[in-house]
Amino acid sequence: MEKLHQCYWKSGEPQSDDIEASRMKRAAAKHLIERYYHQLTEGCGNEACTNEFCASCPTFLRMDNNAAAIKALELYKINAKLCDPHPSKKGASSAYLENSKGAPNNSCSEIKMNKKGARIDFKDVTYLTEEKVYEILELCREREDYSPLIRVIGRVFSSAEALVQSFRKVKQHTKEELKSLQAKDEDKDEDEKEKAACSAAAMEEDSEASSSRIGDSSQGDNNLQKLGPDDVSVDIDAIRRVYTRLLSNEKIETAFLNALVYLSPNVECDLTYHNVYSRDPNYLNLFIIVMENRNLHSPEYLEMALPLFCKAMSKLPLAAQGKLIRLWSKYNADQIRRMMETFQQLITYKVISNEFNSRNLVNDDDAIVAASKCLKMVYYANVVGGEVDTNHNEEDDEEPIPESSELTLQELLGEERRNKKGPRVDPLETELGVKTLDCRKPLIPFEEFINEPLNEVLEMDKDYTFFKVETENKFSFMTCPFILNAVTKNLGLYYDNRIRMYSERRITVLYSLVQGQQLNPYLRLKVRRDHIIDDALVRLEMIAMENPADLKKQLYVEFEGEQGVDEGGVSKEFFQLVVEEIFNPDIGMFTYDESTKLFWFNPSSFETEGQFTLIGIVLGLAIYNNCILDVHFPMVVYRKLMGKKGTFRDLGDSHPVLYQSLKDLLEYEGNVEDDMMITFQISQTDLFGNPMMYDLKENGDKIPITNENRKEFVNLYSDYILNKSVEKQFKAFRRGFHMVTNESPLKYLFRPEEIELLICGSRNLDFQALEETTEYDGGYTRDSVLIREFWEIVHSFTDEQKRLFLQFTTGTDRAPVGGLGKLKMIIAKNGPDTERLPTSHTCFNVLLLPEYSSKEKLKERLLKAITYAKGFGML
């Protein structure tokens, strides 16, 4: 009813007394609403204020202008408490109210700064530009009061709409124009459009029209730079300059911090429920702007602001992540490292400030999960921005491995087969068209992305379960393998292999029940020690042809005429003997380079493809059964196994002499054709030392190598040596390897250098670490006299004797992934003083040591045992 009596009677003629009374009521109401609005947006100035509806109250949650206007109306209706202006702010408050009283309805939100007669309507700033920031900063310096700038930053950086419009690219400035951006703009237009108003009606109009007003901001589209599909509209250099100027002021930095706390939940909501990126790709700007804040890793951000921002950023759709990654890939190494360290700092802080265990999983910590997802974007930016080779893929001409004729356990139970399409591929790799394997040299080393504190608290059995189930509400760190060390990933692979073995065993039992015939639940190999290659080759070839799925069963080896039961130790010796036999230079399957101590495929080998397939199967089985092999391949072999062809740079590892010669050719400054007189025809020798000529191009003997085509010659030569000359042998080798590992997450989790570590173990033998982790049983302790003497003897061994000792106790002379400290050896007492030699259970890394009467006898018996240890018997 009140609205009916505001101005006129029904007759249309104003009654002077009522009009005056109505005007005074409206003025009083307007004045009170303005005070509430001022209190909500600027506060009373008292830092110890306890009024929950005052911006100066420490517990007050900041809000934007529109929300403050609505709240001011509500407070006016309930006659809420109003603060008295604090002495430190009394002048400013009085001026604010005074301006409000005298201002017209559409401009009551103005703040006037009259030091030099300049007037800036800071409340009309709906977005920021570099010029605007410097202008406000200059005026604040003149007044020695930075609170207006702090409020502007708080308002813009807490609003997604405002931040998206800020720091837009414009047409290219000249150097003189860039310098003038930092100077005070004396001729600034005083008639800018006003965004906020203090009256209730104006504020409500603001609320309805804010989005359209931002879209029609004074940064006209005709002044914006035209952008490509992968370009962004934000001026990153301008943002960096602004941050450099502002972050040195502690109070201004606090404004950024508080704004981020308010901004992040709203952004998360926009991305989760409103599909905002598909409607406005420029929404990505706010993530770019925030990530340029070089103080994000500081302790103040780690508690709340950065975790909230990470949660919001992790909600970006795949297309937005891809665009952000492509942008970041253009950054230099220092900028990538800064962003990487920001997320690593948050993960480490959250890990060490909580107690994680099997009941309180690190996978359930939202901040760590979100930070890991954000770190993944930085990781792929590091990959894409490095030296990338997306060509030279072995997989392009790879023959598919036939599927097993047997049904899987899932199919037997009426479910669709899982992993039918092979191992998983990261969606980001598909989006970017780049794999980690394609990166020859990242911007910063891959090792810097590993977070050791996280690896220490990660319950890998639980994480693997989440990895396989792929539920939305459970995160697996195996989807971010870059953050895991080789030991943790190896454990995940171990679980995958074991579960696959048990699955094959259950399938066998089901088949036995259904078909009524006894099938072997193991991959059983019975071999003669002196005919190991022939026996193993025949058996494995039959399995590979009849049912390749049997290769995924648990390996069980028997040596004919020996009593050893294979709990792992017999398999280790089987692998060792096979490797020794196959890599014997007399057989001629591989050539040996004395300078590098490495083997390479013999292009002239007379051996059948089946034997190369066997080597591939053996390597796959070694990984599958968690055994270490003493093989010495160059790194290019593991790259080729993972799907990449060898290139010129790989020759440096596999054929260093040839690599240096070709490198000298590329760097030669003279006339190559006249001085070297070489053609596209090369010469090689066969097994008997006879020369063989090969044309790298058609009629290669007639094509001279010149300064212009020498690069082509080097590439063709490298391709011939590493790929074409050994194509038949390597295809068979790779096929055997993939028969065992084709459904494994091996390729998803590991890089080529880590595959080498899995197969060959560590070459660094740290016996001090072995001593620290060894356990004792049967009466021995760490402080037993014989144990102390034992370690003195072992530490005095030569390197060769140490390898023999490892071979005797563990079945291999190499350290496992993670070093000898991960071996968990046990030394147990095996009776009193005796003439018997020490014995071992290589399956369980147990050394059985009698209590010898003297140190000399202990050394003599131990050396004899490790020197003449061959074969297996039953104790």
UniProtKB/Swiss-Prot annotation:
Mutagenesis / variant outcome for changing N293T: May be associated with AS
Reactions it catalyzes: S-ubiquitinyl-[E2 ubiquitin-conjugating enzyme]-L-cysteine + [acceptor protein]-L-lysine = [E2 ubiquitin-conjugating enzyme]-L-cysteine + N(6)-ubiquitinyl-[acceptor protein]-L-lysine
Disease entry from the Swiss-Prot or TrEMBL record: Angelman syndrome: A neurodevelopmental disorder characterized by severe motor and intellectual retardation, ataxia, frequent jerky limb movements and flapping of the arms and hands, hypotonia, seizures, absence of speech, frequent smiling and episodes of paroxysmal laughter, open-mouthed expression revealing the tongue.
A single GO BP: ubiquitin-dependent protein catabolic process
Result of altering C140R: May be associated with AS
Effect noted on mutating V785I: May be associated with AS
Residues in C4-type zinc fingers: 44-83
GO molecular function, one term: ubiquitin protein ligase activity
Other noteworthy facts: A cysteine residue is required for ubiquitin-thioester formation.
Protein name as it appears in the record: Ubiquitin-protein ligase E3A
Phenotype upon changing L458P: In AS; uncertain significance
A Pfam cross-reference name: AZUL
Keywords: Biological rhythms, Cytoplasm, Disease variant, Host-virus interaction, Metal-binding, Nucleus, Phosphoprotein, Proteasome, Transferase, Ubl conjugation pathway, Zinc, Zinc-finger
Originating gene: UBE3A
InterPro entries, alphabetized: AZUL, AZUL_sf, E3A/B/C-like, HECT_dom, Hect_E3_ubiquitin_ligase, UBE3A
Function (record text): E3 ubiquitin-protein ligase which accepts ubiquitin from an E2 ubiquitin-conjugating enzyme in the form of a thioester and transfers it to its substrates. Several substrates have been identified including the BMAL1, ARC, LAMTOR1, RAD23A and RAD23B, MCM7 (which is involved in DNA replication), annexin A1, the PML tumor suppressor, and the cell cycle regulator CDKN1B. Additionally, may function as a cellular quality control ubiquitin ligase by helping the degradation of the cytoplasmic misfolded proteins. Finally, UBE3A also promotes its own degradation in vivo.
Residue span of region Disordered: 175-226
Annotated segments matching region E6-binding: 401-418
Pathway it works in: Protein modification; protein ubiquitination
Post-translational modification (record): Phosphorylation at Tyr-659 by ABL1 impairs E3 ligase activity and protects p53/TP53 from degradation in (HPV)-infected cells.
Family annotation (CDD domains): HECTc (cd00078)
